[in-house]
Amino acid sequence: MNQYILAIDQGTTSSRAILFNQKGEIVHMAQKEFTQYFPQPGWVEHNANEIWGSVLAVIASVLSEAQVKPEQVAAIGITNQRETTVVWEKDTGNPIYNAIVWQSRQTAGICDELKAKGYDPLFREKTGLLIDAYFSGTKVKWILDHVEGARERAERGELLFGTIDTWLIWKLSGGRAHVTDYSNASRTLMFNIHTLEWDDELLDILGVPKAMLPEVRPSSEVYAKTAPYHFFGVEVPIAGAAGDQQAALFGQACFTEGMAKNTYGTGCFMLMNTGEKAVASKHGLLTTIAWGIDGKVEYALEGSIFVAGSAIQWLRDGLRMIKTAADSEAYAEKVESTDGVYVVPAFVGLGTPYWDSEVRGAVFGLTRGTTKEHFIRATLESLAYQTKDVLAAMEADSGISLTTLRVDGGAVKNNFLMQFQSDLLAVPVERPVVNETTALGAAYLAGLAVGYWNSRDDIAAQWQLERRFEPKMDDDKRTMLYDGWKKAVRAAMAFK
């Protein structure tokens, strides 16, 4: 009987279950969306029980549709939307409040208070992160502040905190394992990435009792087995976990220092492996843990771009310039250039390296001769310019010059964008055969832990190139275009 690895990819808008075989190929996939709650402007919440239900549903679907028996699953790997925060009762397993999602800004006030007290350098030094509503720590504080009696119950050990990986492992194991992995812990604002422990000083500042925190474990090891009543009567090892962007770095086989990947989803996330060094950023990047395996931790630099694929959705749904996202490529290729037009898609502010949440979207360089094609091309090009901003920061911080960029995510199907990205960065861009690199990374982490794959070398050998884009632009043109982008960003930031 063939054995498979089951990856659970729990995302922001949907949960997916993907079966992989020993060659790292997708056997079958199932997906289910769930409800987004917006109780107030800027707030985003999920129902943690609904997420759990969606995960059970996709597991059942993928096994039945692929005609794979539960006992053919060698191990389960979990990857997840990072930072999203759940607090639940230890005895009943019931959440005491909705999950507060990574995008949610409801703790911005708490962050402002912490920054006003001068805590930013302390948090940055210990966690590699900025004080921002994006990360879990202030979300836990918010729940403990707003749910009556919660902090006292947490101190008594009656409540548990977890990011989504922790919640799913706890549920799948029937409450036998309250654990997280190093990569997810490093996104909480409560974990010291140098000592590799929950940090008492930071917990005191946030008012979060240590008793509610999960045990931090390697990203590739058996945490527990599935409770038979949740997995069709079978106990399967839950053997790997990593946050979605770190899992994608692993799935792209970026195992050596200086290798990098960029994921083009709703936003863009670029990670560079910095090996066993936690590189402190002077250019607006986050220092984060890539994964912990075989008794050692490896680090990464991360750049976050808030608007990428969502800019193409805006062309389709907001401006109705295109019928499908794929149409953007054909329109962009009808013109030789944008004719001097720049789109700065700062719909929710700008991320790395600017970290300006007040700036809004802007368009520059319009003339009477500007057409729809120019506008669409300029919007696509903005994804590549933002990526160049991030890469410039990475190279400055790490002292490493990138030799190739591996890419994944929905927008990488756009050949125009990938070619322009290569031209602008002056490095080759490599698109893999398997684009589901996040789930693949989780599968690899779980499979390594149970001997389904033997080593990272085996995994690196499986990585297959679908297409390589080589830079074709001359240096003068590249410099001229990028100077124009920087001018456009400065102008957008001045208009507030």
UniProtKB/Swiss-Prot annotation:
The reaction(s) catalysed by this protein are:
glycerol + ATP = sn-glycerol 3-phosphate + ADP + H(+)
Quaternary structure and partners: Homotetramer and homodimer (in equilibrium).
PTM characteristics: The phosphoenolpyruvate-dependent sugar phosphotransferase system (PTS), including enzyme I, and histidine-containing protein (HPr) are required for the phosphorylation, which leads to the activation of the enzyme.
Matches recorded under NCBIfam families: glycerol_kin (TIGR01311), PRK00047.1 (NF000756)
Its Enzyme Commission number? 2.7.1.30
* Binding locations of ADP: T12, R16, T266, G309, G410, N414
Question: What does the sequence similarity comment in the record state about its family?
Answer: Belongs to the FGGY kinase family.
Q: Where does glycerol bind?
A: R82, E83, Y134, D244, Q245
Name of the protein in its database record: Glycerol kinase
Record the organism. Geobacillus kaustophilus (strain HTA426)
Q: What keyword terms does UniProt attach to this protein?
A: ATP-binding, Glycerol metabolism, Kinase, Nucleotide-binding, Phosphoprotein, Transferase
Binding positions for ATP? T12, T13, S14, T266, G309, Q313, G410
What cellular-component terms does GO give this entry?
cytosol
The record's annotation in InterPro entries points to: ATPase_NBD, Carb_kinase_FGGY, Carb_kinase_FGGY_CS, FGGY_C, FGGY_N, Glycerol_kin
Q: How is its activity regulated?
A: Activated by phosphorylation and inhibited by fructose 1,6-bisphosphate (FBP).
Q: What class of enzyme is it?
A: transferase
**Which domain of life does the UniProt lineage start with?**
Bacteria
Give the binding site residues for sn-glycerol 3-phosphate: T12, R82, E83, Y134, D244
This protein's encoding gene: glpK
Q: What is the lineage of its organism?
A: Bacteria, Bacillati, Bacillota, Bacilli, Bacillales
Pathway of action: Polyol metabolism; glycerol degradation via glycerol kinase pathway; sn-glycerol 3-phosphate from glycerol: step 1/1
